[in-house]
Amino acid sequence: MTIYNFSAGPAVLPKPVLEKAQAEMLDYRSSGMSVLEMSHRSKEFDAIIKDAEYLLRELMAIPDHYRVLFLQGGASTQFSMIPLNLAKGKKAYYHVAGSWGKKAYTEAVKLSKTIPFEPILLASSEEETFSYVPTFDKDVIDPDAAYVHLTTNNTIEGTALYDIPDTNGVPIVADMSSNILAVRYKVNDFGMIYAGAQKNIGPAGVTVVIIRNDLLNSEPALSSMLDYKIQADAQSLYNTPPAYSIYIAKMVFEWVKSLGGLDQMEVKNREKSGLLYSFIEQSSFYQSPVKNPKDRSVANIPFTTPSKDLDEKFVKEAEAAGFKNIKGHRSVGGMRASLYNAFPVEGVIALIDFMRVFENQNSQ
């Protein structure tokens, strides 16, 4: 039985990458060592981390005046790191279109009790269960603010922000954890981008930060480990980095490049998601909780049946049929198909076939 992994993260990785990692597990390029055990100061690992940065710069067209960092702590640590480094004595705006954006804002509010800055809720769609991406008037933003924080893809709710809003000249800080390398964004539109690896980059353990030089803090942050300038000056080697996760990330970047790069990856992702959205649209049995088609994520597609009982039955039968981790997040319910870069189109077609049979067997 073929297994299709719909996990929202950690997520499916490219098979060629896993096979290469397997082949190099005990002896990386005749070094006599596994990447798991080699020094992060060795010439072998120095080449790995430099190649990873070079490839990511090439794929995303990252300008020279941005630094690329490979950090630890997941994207959630960035919720604290961002205000600690960027927001002292200033306003910081938060665009909240999903659960992760809310967590970023909540953490900022918590930090504002101990460091001097003012987190402001710019817009939120929480009152309608984050079923759409809210808009805002740029004129309400203080041009002297530190940043506007937004999330480009809402993993749980299945919405995404493709058109970057006007923020009245204030730098945008973007959480791209679940659609980095999936769709094209212009790096120049952002002051900072960050992403946890475990969706489209590699295994959990490394967090990518892309930050404009002028945003590197001039004053020390609360902790050296949480200081962007210290991390940048140390070239992500202030302490022992998540070496193996960076190694896998480098191979994922190579894989994306081999398939034609980011633009070709976006074409493939829109094809995959389009197949599933089209099927849901023509069905009277399945529903999408996302209100506006323009807000639909290409990476995470939630859907429901007519009842919670049928949702539970669907998940149980789908799991037995090889469709793993398709249960929706507990805050949304239903099902969620996460179609990250490494997820094959064949899996989408197989899921649609299963959905069609389930609908025929369970329609009133």
Curated annotation (Swiss-Prot):
Pathway: Amino-acid biosynthesis; L-serine biosynthesis; L-serine from 3-phospho-D-glycerate: step 2/3. It is an enzyme of class 2 (transferase). It holds the Pfam family Aminotran_5. It is found in: Cytoplasm. Keywords: Amino-acid biosynthesis, Aminotransferase, Cytoplasm, Pyridoxal phosphate, Serine biosynthesis, Transferase. Its EC number is 2.6.1.52. Binds 1 pyridoxal phosphate per subunit. The keyword Transport does not apply. PROSITE patterns: AA_TRANSFER_CLASS_5. Pyridoxal 5'-phosphate binds at A75, S76, W100, T155, D175, Q198, N239, T240. One of its GO terms (biological process) is L-serine biosynthetic process. InterPro entries: Aminotrans_V_dom (IPR000192), Aminotrans_V_PyrdxlP_BS (IPR020578), Pser_aminoTfrase (IPR022278), PyrdxlP-dep_Trfase (IPR015424), PyrdxlP-dep_Trfase_major (IPR015421), PyrdxlP-dep_Trfase_small (IPR015422). The modification N6-(pyridoxal phosphate)lysine is found at K199. Its cofactor is pyridoxal 5'-phosphate. It catalyses: O-phospho-L-serine + 2-oxoglutarate = 3-phosphooxypyruvate + L-glutamate; 4-(phosphooxy)-L-threonine + 2-oxoglutarate = (R)-3-hydroxy-2-oxo-4-phosphooxybutanoate + L-glutamate. L-glutamate binds at R41. The keyword Amino-acid biosynthesis applies. GO terms for molecular function: O-phospho-L-serine:2-oxoglutarate aminotransferase activity; pyridoxal phosphate binding. Belongs to the class-V pyridoxal-phosphate-dependent aminotransferase family. SerC subfamily. Homodimer. This is Phosphoserine aminotransferase. It comes from Streptococcus uberis (strain ATCC BAA-854 / 0140J). The gene is serC.
